[in-house]
């Protein structure tokens, strides 16, 4: 079931940078971007009607196998950011998510990247993405933007 690079609906997650997320230089620590990617991914999945808790409750997980983050501009304490997440690709055993961290007022990109995940069962063995999960993840396409209130 290869689905290479169609434009799926984006889900925006608004975040205000907390002091604890900054480093000694007064900018957001590089590790926080990855935490925000995860928060965006979990929120995207919930908005798609596929809460991660439901997947895990059914005995499946998505193990991270690849992660890339390109840092483009510094973010500081108190800044408003928006993590925009979309499905990048869905294959029989792999899911990819694409992320942009933007300034919600100017649209400036602070960072972008992706994560790739392998579907694993409760014993940690690689398995196919269940059809019921794939169907829900594929449920929205470009032009059908997710709402934070959905």
Regions flagged by a language model, labelled:
Residues 2-47:
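Catalytic strand-loop segment that frames the active site of acyl-thioester-processing enzymes
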Residues 2-13, 46, 75-77, 87-150:
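HotDog/MaoC-like acyl-thioester-processing domains
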Residues 14, 29, 63, 70, ...:
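Conserved beta-strand segments that form the floor/walls of ligand-binding pockets within enzyme
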Residues 15-19, 71, 119:
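Hydrophobic residues in beta-strands and at strand termini
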Residues 20-23, 40, 50, 57, ...:
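Residue-level signal for pocket-adjacent positions within structured domains
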Residues 33-36, 63, 98:
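Residue-level recognition of specific faces of alpha-helices
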Residues 44-95:
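Hydrophobic beta-strand-centered segment that forms part of the acyl-chain substrate-binding groove
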């Amino acid at each position: 079931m290869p689905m290479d690079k169609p434009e799926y609906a984006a889900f925006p997650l608004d975040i205000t940078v907390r002091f604890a997320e900054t480093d000694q230089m007064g900018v957001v620590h590089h590790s926080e971007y990855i935490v925000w990617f995860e928060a965006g991914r979990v929120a995207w999945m919930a908005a798609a009607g596929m809460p991660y808790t439901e997947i895990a409750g059914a005995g499946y997980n998505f193990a991270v196998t690849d992660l890339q983050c390109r840092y483009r501009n510094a973010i500081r304490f108190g800044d408003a950011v928006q993590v925009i997440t979309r499905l990048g690709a869905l294959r029989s055993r792999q899911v990819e998510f694409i992320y942009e961290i933007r300034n919600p007022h100017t649209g400036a990109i602070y960072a972008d990247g992706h994560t790739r995940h392998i579907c694993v069962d409760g014993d940690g063995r690689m398995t196919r993405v269940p059809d019921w999960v794939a169907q829900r993840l594929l449920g929205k396409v470009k032009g059908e933007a997710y709402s934070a209130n959905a």
